[in-house]
Amino acid sequence: GITEVKKISDMAHAYDVGIQVHCAGSPLTTNAALHLECTLPNFLIHEHHTCNRMDTSVGLTKYNLQPENGYFTVPDLPGIGNEFLQEAIDRATLYKVIE
C-alpha cells in the first residue's frame, strides 16, 4: 500500500537511491501515485501507461488526469482526489469468490 511504499522510499533515500513508482493501472492508481510521489524527495519520474488513455479507463472515474506538456497537476481534492463513477460500478462484472 501507499504507507509501505513511503517506508521503502524513505529507506532508499537514506542511501541516495531514486524512486519511480510503477503505475500501470487505472486512473485511481494514477491519482494515488501522484500524491505519493509529491512526498518523495528521491522521486525521479512518473510512469504514465498507455492504458490510462484508453476509453475503458477514461470512463472509470470522475476526473481524467492526463499530463499537459509533460507535467501533471496534482489534485487537491479530498482523499486521493478521484472517485469511481457510479456508471462504471454498475457495469462492472461481479465475481463470486466464496460460496
Enumerate the language-model features and the residues they cover.
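Shared catalytic-loop signature of beta/alpha-barrel
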Residues: 1-71, 75
